[in-house]
C-alpha cells in the first residue's frame, strides 16, 4: 500500500499541482488492518472539483495497479468544510494524512456533533436491522450492520473517553461491556458463514437492542 500511495500521490501532483489541499488514506489500510480483500480508500481534497477534474481523476486511477480495489472520496475544500458535522468528525479522526493536514477541521465539530454521529449511526442500524428481520432475512445484510456498528462504536468510545481509537483491537479496551460484545460479534461474523435461523434471530435481536439503547441515550 505504501508503494501504491506513493505512485498515487505522485500522479496527483502531476495533474493537480498546488490545487491539492489534502491527500489521505481511510479504511482498513489506514487502520493497518487490511486483508487481501480490502479496498483502497484514498482521499483527495482539491481547491474545487469540476467535471474535467473528475474525469482526470478517474483516468488517473485507471492507470494505476489494483484499479478494482481503488475507491474512497474526492471533494472540493469548501464542500468539505461545510459538510455534515457528524460525518466530518469521523472523517477527521479516521483519515491518515499523506499530503497536508486536517487539523483545521477540529474547530468545525463539537460534542453535540459526536452525539449526532452516534444517534444517526444507531438509527440507521436499527432501521436496517428491523427491515432485514422482517423482509430480507439476510446474513450478509446482518454482517454489514455489525460492520457499521463498529464506526458508531468509535464515536461512542470517543464520547466516553475523549480518545478516538481507529483500530478495532484498541477500541475494544475503551468500550463498555455491552458495546464490546457488539464489536466482538462483528469481528466473529466477518469470517464466518452461518445459516442457522435461530442464531440469525438472536444476533439480530442483540444488535437491535443495542441500537435502541444508543438512540434513546443520545
Per-region residue spans from a language model:
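Catalytic core of pol beta-like nucleotidyltransferases
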Residues: 1-18, 30-36, 47-218
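Short, glycine- and small/hydrophobic-rich beta-strand elements in well-ordered beta-sheets
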Residues: 18-26
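N-terminal loops that bind phosphate or other acidic moieties
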Residues: 41
